């Protein structure tokens, strides 16, 4: 990271910048020594020929898709999918055309049970992000076939700062915390200012313990409506109707 709040592109020589509204609120964190160390680490992994996901231009895609003042709800994930072609910078989301991961299938099951919305034919959650749902992983990069490979390298401090900044500088947001990891990360959230919804992780290993049936999507909209932020449209268009201009840009592919 440098003085411009930029991150090294892990798949090319170019640099990318944090979206301007986020840079104004959290960009100073990118100047910290641990973020410079992270930048050096990512550069070294690239030089070593390691495949790092998502591509560099999509590392900050969650912020690009959901500017600071447009955030209504936050879904916290752990780290990106580690299979080739899956991750594109939004937690739980995969690029159009990729098979649906098991956790996302359970999210869609709950969406249908809660709101009656039929499962889409793709796993791209970019429409949610564009409507104000920050889809934030705690760790923003991973290596091919190695889940958690970049944990403890510096991303957690940055994303903790993002959560804390939203907690302090915004009001009336909904934080959807699925699983113990997300719930630990969300301990700083002031429940007098925001709604915190907790459930087990949607993984097949735990979804039956309370994620399925949690009704978080309708509870989120009920709270947002009561606090004047406007409800989230949780519907997802069919793959053929996704905005090709967006999907061919830096965020989704």
UniProtKB/Swiss-Prot annotation:
It catalyses: Hydrolyzes single-stranded DNA or mismatched double-stranded DNA and polynucleotides, releasing free uracil. SUPFAM superfamilies: Uracil-DNA glycosylase-like. Gene3D superfamilies: Uracil-DNA glycosylase-like domain. The active site is at 79 (proton acceptor). Its main location: cytoplasm. It is found in: Cytoplasm. One of its GO terms (biological process) is base-excision repair, AP site formation via deaminated base removal. It is an enzyme of class 3 (hydrolase). Belongs to the uracil-DNA glycosylase (UDG) superfamily. UNG family. Excises uracil residues from the DNA which can arise as a result of misincorporation of dUMP residues by DNA polymerase or due to deamination of cytosine. This is Uracil-DNA glycosylase. It comes from Xylella fastidiosa (strain M12). The gene is ung.
């Amino acid at each position: 990271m440098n003085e411009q709040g930029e991150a090294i592109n892990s798949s090319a020589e170019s640099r990318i910048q944090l979206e301007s509204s986020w840079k104004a609120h959290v960009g100073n964190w990118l100047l910290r020594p641990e973020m410079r160390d992270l930048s050096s680490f990512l550069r070294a992994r690239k030089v070593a020929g390691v495949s790092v996901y998502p591509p560099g231009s999509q590392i900050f895609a969650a912020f690009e898709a959901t500017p600071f003042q447009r955030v209504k709800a936050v879904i916290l994930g752990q780290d990106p999918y580690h299979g080739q072609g899956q991750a594109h910078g939004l937690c739980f989301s995969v690029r159009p055309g990729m098979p649906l991961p098991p956790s996302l299938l359970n999210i869609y099951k709950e969406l249908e049970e809660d709101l009656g919305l039929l499962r889409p034919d793709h796993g791209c959650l970019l429409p949610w992000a564009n409507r104000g749902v920050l889809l934030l992983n705690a760790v923003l990069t991973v290596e091919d076939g190695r889940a958690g490979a970049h944990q403890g390298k510096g991303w957690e401090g940055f994303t903790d700062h993002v959560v804390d900044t939203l907690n302090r500088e915004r009001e009336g947001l909904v934080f959807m915390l699925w699983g113990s990891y997300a719930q630990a990360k969300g301990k700083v959230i002031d429940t007098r200012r925001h709604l915190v919804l907790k459930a087990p992780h949607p993984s097949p290993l735990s979804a039956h313990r309370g994620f399925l049936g949690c009704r978080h999507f309708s509870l989120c909209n009920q709270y947002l409506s009561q606090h004047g932020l406007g409800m989230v449209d949780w519907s997802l268009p069919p793959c053929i109707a996704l905005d090709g201009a967006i999907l061919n840009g830096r965020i989704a592919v």
